[in-house]
Each structure stands twice: as structure tokens, then as C-alpha cells.
Amino acid sequence: TDWYETVKLNYGVDYQNGGTCHFSPTPDTWIKMLDILLFWASKDIDGFRCDMAEMVPVEFWEWAIPQVKEAYPEILFIAEVYNPGEYRNYLFRGKFDYLYDKVGLYDTLRNVACGYESASAITHCWQSLNGIEKKMLNFLENHDEQRIASDFFAGNPRKGIPALIVSACMNTNPMMIYFGQEFGELGMDSEGFSGRDGRTTIFDYWSVDSIRRWRNGGKFDGKMLTEEHKHLYSIYQKVLTICNEEQAISK
């Protein structure tokens, strides 16, 4: 399957003839994409989150990422790779810094939080990584997934706290917090394109309630947050502080 509405770029793979690869001479798409990467890197961004990176030949990333890092050594490349069999390929050959841990830890923690699996299933997650756990990016929310507090997930942001502690403290790898997650954003608005599906729209101009309250008209003082927002935020602050400062967890 693929996105029907997107422009298709030729990375040098002949998908009509058995997926044969034609990488020499360097495909024109590679050169153009490298120029785009270098352009944005020059704007002092922190890094790139590469959507469905496994749908692009690993040979491209192997070629492009070192060139970007040569010019901008501190920049990060995070890949969305959902096939565990390709994890090491995109980490070690493709040169990515981190991969989303979606089909392993995220899916398991969601099932545990919703009562579909026992917490013992978490053991298989870390064992299956077998040495690359430090290269995985943990998360509980992102633009693709339903909000913890939504009716489609846990229905209450506090029910996600045990999963937060596991994600943040189990290993020394990074943990991503999606905007408004720390306030218990519901994601239950009926936005124009996607409707009420438990996600915050990425297709519409929309006002996210918890973020609007935190911004407070540009003051960014959080004074419009509810007591429930503030309480959850304090828990997130404590957990994230502990996982970064407590040596038993951070080392």
C-alpha cells in the first residue's frame, strides 16, 4: 500500500521489474534530496524525522546522511521503520541515529494500558532488541496515533502514567513527548478532515485546547491550564527529571 495523493519519486528502483536497483550513476532524485536536506540543515534545525524511511532504499540514506553530518555533525536523523527485520539495516548501514519503537514497545504498552495484554509482554520487547535498545526512540503519542486521554485509547490521561514511567526509565534511549501529551490533551475534537478519531489533526488549521491554555495569549505561563492539566504536567516533569538526573536510570 502507498499514499495515493503523493508525488512518486524515483530513487533508482525499478518496481515494475522485480525491484531491480540502478544506483550508478547516482540517481538525480538522490542529488535533489540531498540538496533539500542540506538546505534545511543550514536553518539550524535539530534534526530530521524521516517518514516511512524504509520505503526509501537504504542505499540512499547510506549515501546522504554522512554527507549531511559532515557539514552539520550535531544534526539528528530519526527514522520511522516498522519492520523489525530492517532495524539494524537502517541503523548501521543507513546511518540513522534513532528509530521509532512503534511495533514493539508502543504497541505493547498500549495493549497493556487497555487491558489487552499482560505487563509480562514488555519483557519480549526489550529482549527482542538485543543490543540496539539505546538506538530506539520511545513514545506514547505522535501525530499518527490516538491520544492516551481519548475515548479510543485509555480514556483518561492518568492511565498512561505507568506506561510513561516504563518508556522513560527502562533504558537510556530518548523519549519523545508529543505536544499537549504532558497536559492530557484529549484529541476528541471533530476536526474538518479527519473528524473525531482520537487524534489531533495535522490536516486542518486547528486550536489545540491544552496548548492554547498553556500559551495564554502568548504569555506562555500556563495560567489558563486546569488543575487536572497542572497535576499531570507535574507528574511528567518529575518522571522526566528523574530519568535524566538519577544515575541508576540515566547511566
Task: Enumerate the language-model features and the residues they cover.
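Generic structural signal for well-ordered alpha-helices
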Residues: 37-38, 61-65, 122-123, 164, ...
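Structural preference for beta-strand elements that scaffold enzyme active sites
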Residues: 47-49, 74-78, 97-99, 135-138, ...
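Substrate-binding cleft/loops of secretory-pathway carbohydrate-active enzymes
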Residues: 58-70, 81-115, 186-195
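Active-site groove signature of glycoside hydrolases
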Residues: 33-58, 138, 142
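Loop/helix patches that line or flank the sugar-binding groove of alpha-linked glycan CAZymes
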Residues: 121, 130-136, 141-142, 147-251
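Acidic/aromatic-lined carbohydrate-recognition and catalytic surfaces
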Residues: 1-9, 42, 49, 54-85
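Glycoside hydrolase catalytic-domain groove-lining segments
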Residues: 108-134
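Substrate-binding/active-site clefts of carbohydrate-active enzymes
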Residues: 1-39, 64, 70
